[in-house]
Amino acid sequence: MEAKLDLSALNHAERLVLQTDLWFGSFSDAQQQQLLQQGRRRVLSAGQPLFSRGAPFCGIYVVLQGQLLISGLHQSGQQALLTLLTPGQWLGEIAWFDQMPRTHDVQALTDSQLLQFPKTALQQLVQQDPLWWQRFGQLLTVKLRLLFVELEDRALLPAKQRLARRLCQLSNDQQLQIPLQQEQLGQLLSLSRQTTNQLLRQLAEAGLLQTRYGTIELLNRPALVQLAQHGTLLS
């Protein structure tokens, strides 16, 4: 389902998602309006693909509600889960810069709503104001910085601390339920299912979370943040 964006249709929660995003929130009111006018609302049901690896560029997106999985299917038939996108996160800008096909598969993990900024709208935007190339470049470099941080974490941090960091990244004070199976969470962290289950049990015994099939619920997010930052629970 796709409909042209009516700015008045953005509810308070959706506006808050955009305003609290560091990239979008750095723009002036006029720049925000200029970008949003090019947006189109997209609605996805759980399990519905947004686009597939190899597909042509169709626009840049931002998640307003729900969660999306980015994954890749190896030629061996094994699927690699790369990351989970939550409200306020942008995607699709790589293919905008290099004009190459999509690098990975993206599908909705839950019922989701997004804003799409189609290719033709983006072309019109940068023609009107070439500085948008620099602004979109800043969005891309934010992703690169996060990627380097994650690579460093994988090399240096113990598995429990990396798990805590990822759980904090996938949640906030209002969203404490993470709709992931334990095996999926392990794939995001490059941990075995056995190791992931063992670490989750330890965190559950400490009262930080509880697990149900397909869902991880955080019970003490502040303590989890401490573990993510310091590698241990502070008294």
Task: List PLM regions with ranges.
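Cyclic nucleotide-binding regulatory module and flanking cytosolic helices
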Residues: 1-46, 95-96
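Short, small/polar residue-rich loop motifs at catalytic or cofactor-binding pockets
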Residues: 36-37, 55-57
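Glycine- and acidic-residue-biased ligand/ion/polar-headgroup-sensing regions
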Residues: 47, 58-71, 87-88
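Short phosphate-coordinating micro-motif centered on Lys-Gly-acidic
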Residues: 49-55
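Cyclic-nucleotide recognition modules
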Residues: 81-138, 145
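Short, Lys/Arg-enriched, Trp-marked, Pro/Gly-tolerant hinge/linker segments that flank
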Residues: 147-159
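Phosphate-/nucleic-acid-contacting segments
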Residues: 157-162, 167-235
